[in-house]
UniProtKB/Swiss-Prot annotation:
Keywords: Glycosidase, Hydrolase
Origin: domain of life: Bacteria
Name of protein: Beta-fructosidase
Gene coding for it: bfrA
Catalytic activity, EC: 3.2.1.26
Length: 432
């Protein structure tokens, strides 16, 4: 009932963070935190999938397993070196059953992108750099100025989130360079990612205090990120652990449509699975602002146009599933409702604010989220509905992502605006 038609999800078991996103030898590889045994967190492995186009995904065998029942292969990244694929990841040992450091950084290698061999010299980073560090995980590695650069999520004394920087010439021997960023609003930072877009260094990171993905944009200079602007990478409730692809000529990011906040309410567990990835998005900088938009490849999902109108009103859609895209262009203000007789999601745009209300979206409930927006002569909202999620993009600039669980088809669409053009496209089921 709730299995997505065009989002990536595990056929069975639990999935969380995307890991090791890489474009390698003409294909997009996505690894992810995975428990193949049951739809709950635990026994964490690295699941693996591959795509030719970022849209149609194929499941592959598990890439990395833990060595012991009390261990886990936690989040990390992938890079290419000498034609081979290298995975850099956090290895976890449950401290209640194991001695020594609970989180260390390790490496695995593959020549074919399918079979991975763990490095005999693991761990390549055996302990945190200083006392008081209570989190030490999620290495994201990129190439910069002729060397490998790793950022790690961390925390200090259960009070402040930190991002640590390491450098290496060979992926096996790492030098600690220091703390490049701190966030006092959270006790730890997870899944950091440092990318450069144009002339800007952009740190993307997740914080446990609000289960959100944030960005800080500025310049990395003399071992510190000098922040010029910061904000949310996504303004919804359910976007987390975002990571960018290695090896692409643009910055493409995927996040986990997270299940932490309302895990017990999610009915997908009854279907034997839990976890959905976001649609792939492109990040870019325009007018000194970090912006986000759906990747162009998603246009290939459109099967047929099921509805269009150039006026306000309430309309019945010819759809059999919650699997469609709405494209709405308008001037000024708008109220857009998508739902059925008992469930709905409401998007409201006033002069300078966009509000999304998912409180009546389905059995798992929801929240109201809002963001300040810049009004344009013609505004555009793209909404992607897919069984158990909805993602909104406004003016190819900001995004809102939510997990929802409607019990019936959203076949009623209501729009109120002075000037509007609205189209609805049925989208392909990539799993058939």
């Amino acid at each position: 009932m709730f299995k997505p038609n065009y989002h990536f999800f595990p056929i069975t078991g639990w999935m969380n963070d995307p890991n090791g996103l890489i474009f390698w030898k003409g294909k997009y590889h996505m690894f992810y935190q995975y428990n193949p045994r049951k739809p709950e967190w635990g026994n964490i492995c690295w699941g693996h999938a591959v795509s030719d186009d970022l849209v149609h995904w194929r499941h592959l065998p598990v890439a990395l397993y833990p060595d012991d029942e009390t261990h886990g292969v936690f989040s990390g990244s992938a890079v290419e070196k000498d034609g081979k694929m290298f995975l850099v990841y956090t290895y976890y040992r449950d401290p209640t059953h194991n001695k020594g450091e609970k989180e260390t950084q390790c490496v695995a290698m593959s020549e074919n992108g399918l079979d991975f061999v763990k490095y005999d010299g693991n761990p390549v980073i055996s302990k945190p750099p200083e006392e008081g560090t209570h989190a030490f995980r999620d290495p994201k590695v990129n190439r910069s100025n002729g060397e490998w650069r790793m950022v790690l999520g961390s925390g200090k004394d259960e009070k402040i989130g930190r991002v640590l920087l390491y450098t290496s010439d060979d992926l096996f021997h790492w030098k600690y360079e220091g703390v490049i960023f701190e966030d006092e609003t959270t006790k730890e930072i997870e899944c950091p990612d440092l990318v450069r877009i144009g002339e800007k260094d952009i740190l993307i990171y997740s914080i446990t205090s609000t289960n959100s993905v944030l960005f800080s944009m500025g310049e990395l200079k003399e071992g510190k990120l000098n922040v010029e602007k910061r904000g949310l990478l996504d303004h919804g409730t359910d976007f987390y652990a975002a990571q960018t692809f290695f090896g692409t000529d643009r910055v493409v990011v995927i996040g986990w449509l997270q299940s932490w906040l309302r895990t017990g309410l999610y009915p997908t567990k009854r279907e034997g699975w839990n976890g959905v990835m976001s649609l792939p998005r492109e990040l870019y900088v325009e007018n000194n602002e970090l912006k986000v938009k759906p990747v162009d490849e998603l246009l290939a999902l459109r099967k047929r146009k099921v509805f269009e109108t150039a006026k306000s009103g309430t309309f019945l859609l010819d759809v059999k599933e919650n699997s469609y895209e709405i494209v709405c262009e308008f001037s000024g203000e708008i109220e857009l409702r998508m739902g059925n007789e008992s469930e709905e999601v409401v998007i409201t745009k006033s002069r300078d604010e966009l509000i999304v209300d998912t409180t009546r979206s389905g059995v798992s409930g929801g929240e109201v989220r809002k963001s300040t927006v810049e009004d344009e002569a013609t505004n555009r909202i793209r909404a992607f509905l897919d069984s158990c999620s909805v993602e909104f993009f406004f003016n190819d600039s900001i995004a809102f992502s939510f997990r929802i669980h409607p019990e019936n088809v959203y076949n009623i669409l209501s729009v109120k605006s002075n000037q509007v053009k609205l189209e609805v496209f049925e989208l392909e089921n990539i799993w058939l």
